[in-house]
Amino acid sequence: MSDDKFDAIVVGAGVAGSVAALVMARAGLDVLVIERGDSAGCKNMTGGRLYAHTLEAIIPGFAVSAPVERKVTREKISFLTEESAVTLDFHREQPDVPQHASYTVLRNRLDPWLMEQAEQAGAQFIPGVRVDALVREGNKVTGVQAGDDILEANVVILADGVNSMLGRSLGMVPASDPHHYAVGVKEVIGLTPEQINDRFNITGEEGAAWLFAGSPSDGLMGGGFLYTNKDSISLGLVCGLGDIAHAQKSVPQMLEDFKQHPAIRPLISGGKLLEYSAHMVPEGGLAMVPQLVNEGVMIVGDAAGFCLNLGFTVRGMDLAIASAQAAATTVIAAKERADFSASSLAQYKRELEQSCVMRDMQHFRKIPALMENPRLFSQYPRMVADIMNEMFTIDGKPNQPVRKMIMGHAKKIGLINLLKDGIKGATAL
């Protein structure tokens, strides 16, 4: 390892860490990325779907050479009970505007490619090394300690993922609140491209993204997801960490039951399990965003809690990339000023406030509280399924008007509850 002082050391080679290194290296900064895994992305998990707009701004036309899987053209949202599914299906032609596109990705392919772009721009990358501590002189972070080695830098960017222990060691990241996190589990199941296209009604390199609420998380806060890759599908679920103690089954068992659901089982029939992973997921929204800047240090990506689950979209990577670009731009400007103090690095927060990151985090700040409503994942999926079942059942008895069907099932939840939940949902979204 070099004894020289770096302009910046980035801890973590996920999407945020790699992009931060790329932007700084392009500007001629001396950048080192340290990753505890054996390669970039090997410790990371996502559903996963990448909304292209932020990476497109940094690497125009990236999808031509990047190892993306499929461009998403089919969107599905389902409410599941144990035996039924009510599904909204939206299909569109592939967007002509690259910034409007989104892609399914596998992190063990995407992240090494991103790190390769950073290295080609001049960044140094050291995998398989754990950063044990941050080095400080007084209140200022001046580098990192890895084993017996101390590496110095003007700025350290923490891209070490959700529940950042290094951020916590500085007092920047508070103790974990279980209601701010979820546990995610995922399987990658191999299928042929022809099977995928036939089963999901897509063609060529089109992709499908499918979100589920209700039975996948056993009626608790959370939900399921399915993304089509080139020759596999990513199938998994998340369950709120604060709800797991009340669950009737383990998270792995939830996934097994999800795979056996009548709406899912035919889609994965004959598939081969290629990968299993589990990970913590930030779900707290704006309320869990920690102190982002201190003397000589900034926090980006999942470590900063930049994730938005709106129920119909789940965003993390695009926000991580935007935060990484903001942090990198700040370091570049700080070097020009020869000022790496907290007041100088506060430009990072201003950059975030002008980007989609804090604007969207602020706009949807009420979503996490909305998602804690247990009726969203238990009673409402059941109500929708029961209404649809009654509408489509013809048994020789006189049919009720649809309005009476709906009102009868709505009363089971309570009209006041429906009104309160509707108002809360409208104000949150």
UniProtKB/Swiss-Prot annotation:
* Physiological role: Probably accepts electrons from YdiQ/YdiR and reduces a quinone.
Source organism's superkingdom?
Bacteria
Residue numbers binding FAD: 8-22
Q: Keywords in alphabetical order, please.
A: FAD, Flavoprotein, Oxidoreductase
> InterPro entries from the entry?
FAD-bd (IPR002938), FAD/NAD-bd_sf (IPR036188), FixC-like (IPR039651)
**EC class of the enzyme, as a word:** oxidoreductase
Name its co-factor(s).
Answer: FAD
Q: Read off the PANTHER family from this record.
A: ELECTRON TRANSFER FLAVOPROTEIN-QUINONE OXIDOREDUCTASE YDIS-RELATED
Give one GO term, molecular function aspect.
Answer: FAD binding
Concerning its family, UniProt says: Belongs to the ETF-QO/FixC family.
EC annotation?
Answer: 1.5.5.-
Know the name of this protein?
A: Probable electron transfer flavoprotein-quinone oxidoreductase YdiS
